[in-house]
Amino acid sequence: MGERPYVAADATEDLEWERLELLQTLYDTSTTQQLARLGIRAGWQCLEVGAGRGSIAHWLAGCVGPVGRVVAADMDPRLLRRVSLPSNVEIRTLNILTQAVEVQQYDLVYCRALLMNVPQPVLYP
């Protein structure tokens, strides 16, 4: 696990769009139920790493309200730019293998189906 290349690295943008749509359909309900248990409040600053099509970033934006902020980060944010996201969502290009993340500035840092694609030596040096 984590040793193989990213499963969708060579997928076309349209195929990746469809793959991520399937993930949303399968996992968004349980994901938002679990996140809701955290008690996310208005004004929170949230970071979603590997935001894909932005469904969870969109949901988080509703939780944090207009005074909160959600950063939807992905190493290839083209798919994020294809969807309409609330004004309190900022799209950012981020590769967690090569770029540092200032996690202290966030109340919540979240990822789903991401860490399995990170090489183990990065997770456990």
Show the residue positions of the predicted features.
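Class I SAM-dependent methyltransferase Rossmann-like catalytic core
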Residues: 3-28
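Conserved alpha-helix/loop element of class I SAM-dependent methyltransferases that forms part
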Residues: 25-42, 59
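Class I SAM-dependent methyltransferase SAM/SAH-binding core
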Residues: 47, 52-99
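A short acidic, Gly/Pro-enriched loop at the edge of an enzyme's catalytic core
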Residues: 98-108
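A short beta-strand submotif of the Rossmann-like class I SAM-dependent methyltransferase core
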Residues: 111
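Hydrophobic adenine-recognition pocket in adenosine-nucleotide-binding enzymes
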Residues: 114
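A short, conserved alpha-helix within the catalytic core of class I
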Residues: 118-125
